[in-house]
Amino acid sequence: MGKIIGIDLGTTNSCVAVLEGDEPKVIQNPEGARTTPSVVAFKNGETQVGEVAKRQAITNPNTIQSIKREMGTDYKVDVDGKNYTPQEISAMILQNLKSTAESYLGDKVDKAVITVPAYFNDAERQATKDAGKIAGLEVERIINEPTAAALAYGLDKTEQDEKVLVFDLGGGTFDVSILELGDGVFEVLSTAGDNKLGGDDFDQVIIDYLVEEFKKENGIDLSQDKMALQRLKDAAEKAKKDLSGVSQTQISLPFISAGESGPLHLEITLTRSKFEELSDELVRRTMGPTRQALSDAGLSSNDIDEVILVGGSTRIPAVQEAVKKEVGKEPNKSVNPDEVVAMGAAIQGGVISGDVKDVVLLDVTPLSLGIEIMGGRMNTLIERNTTIPTSKSQVYSTAADNQPAVDIHVLQGERPMASDNKTLGRFSLTDIPPAPRGVPQIEVTFDIDKNGIVNVTAKDLGTNKEQNITIESSSALSDDEIDRMVKDAEQNAEEDKKRREESDLRNEADSLVFQVDKTLKDLGDNVSEDDKKQAEDKKEALKSALEGQDLEDIKTKKEELEKVVQELSMKVYQQAQQGDAAGSNQSDVEDAEYTEVKDDDDKKDNK
């Protein structure tokens, strides 16, 4: 069985890991970094992913960031008249990580475990699975990020029983999970969170502050200038990171705008205390789900043995202090918050492939599931924090005499009224035989699989007629759409590969032309005019080919010039050897004369 890679598909950054022996290993990307920015850019028909896409975000409006926040919605990204779904953009990031893993392993990779925030609903999980499929990956398991982190933390601690609180504050989402670890069993007791809270929001409060200060001073609203906003975003992110280590940082953005008197510059000193004041509301928002998770698990903060911080945003000192104050324990800093989730996913891949033994993962569903009943109320079948996979059935009846069909409105959420919860889907059970109200017996069954994805079945117990659906939200993709996107992704990957090969070939050819010029200059009179002319002719032929689009011609001309350069180098090398040999012989003669003179002197001394 091939390797199953572990992928942390993050809002801001993503990470890929693989199990090597008993240890998960984070794979470096081609730039040598252990995480890859979750950024996709479209430029001149080419798709760019990661650091290269992030670097040109200021000047390229076709740059997409934080797409994870739109997963499970019907949001579309318009790029030069073509619409892309969040699944397609995420697939491009996954494809990049897949390629990184393949380069490292030297083998094809087609299976993965992908992590999602624990608080992701059904639509968001399904969208993540679809993204994997578009990227050419068979998603063996979708697991929750805090659970993955606990796996990585607790793999070598299976002898002792521990209750662990995982506090996961990423770029765009926030989760708290409480797990019990012991004897190789990782059981999630509860989970809570906020899918619209993360590092991006901490950046935003700095951006808002900078915009406000600049407007006060210069009367210009930078939030209306797209390019200025991107520069502010980059500066805010950097300032946030700086303030995790220092008490103040200088934000300097020259030529950010222009006024009547000329160019305007933004120069502001941001202190950690000011940042803490700006972000206080965000930090306090993380405490609600933390208390909720403890309450749902039936635990107090005194029952927690370890606190694990996950996600880059947990490096913010105010966040660490708030967690410490709430739980009453110093957070464990033995895990890397940016990498631990991918490492846990790789371990889960090892569990699935059989490489990791004696580890059992018991996860939970983050939100309650039920259907709408009379009066617009929600009737819950599966409570939140129920261990998955699970199945639950309940019998309902008709609301009117001779009712021929029932509509099943599937809901996810905690509110008593159906309209206040998220609709996962609707379907109908038809052809119910005429009968008085309350007589027909309709059994509704909810199934949640190991990925947290929901199937619902409705069955008329009188006729045994059955209707079922795998929940698909308005954002879900049909098999045909996924197949089309898979083909597009493969085609784009092939085209990108060709573009890269062309770029590499042209760069190598340019470099060779420069090298030939330098070599001929260095050799000077050591090369015959005929050899020089031949090299010059081949060089000009290659330069001419580079102006065209025929790659085969460039390749041929490059090889011809390389051959001439090799022959030149050989001749020069041989000449150098001959020169050394001649010099060596001359040296021997001089030594002999010296010896003879020495003998004469000796004779004189003897006289």
UniProtKB/Swiss-Prot annotation:
Induction: By stress conditions e.g. heat shock. Signal peptide: none annotated. Pfam families: HSP70 (PF00012). Residues 490-510, 524-555, 574-607 are annotated as: Disordered. The keyword Phosphoprotein applies. Residues 490-509, 524-542, 595-607 have a biased composition (Basic and acidic residues). InterPro entries: ATPase_NBD (IPR043129), Chaperone_DnaK (IPR012725), Heat_shock_70_CS (IPR018181), HSP70_C_sf (IPR029048), HSP70_peptide-bd_sf (IPR029047), Hsp_70_fam (IPR013126). Keywords: ATP-binding, Chaperone, Nucleotide-binding, Phosphoprotein, Stress response. The keyword Phosphoprotein applies. Acts as a chaperone. Belongs to the heat shock protein 70 family. This is Chaperone protein DnaK. It comes from Staphylococcus carnosus (strain TM300).
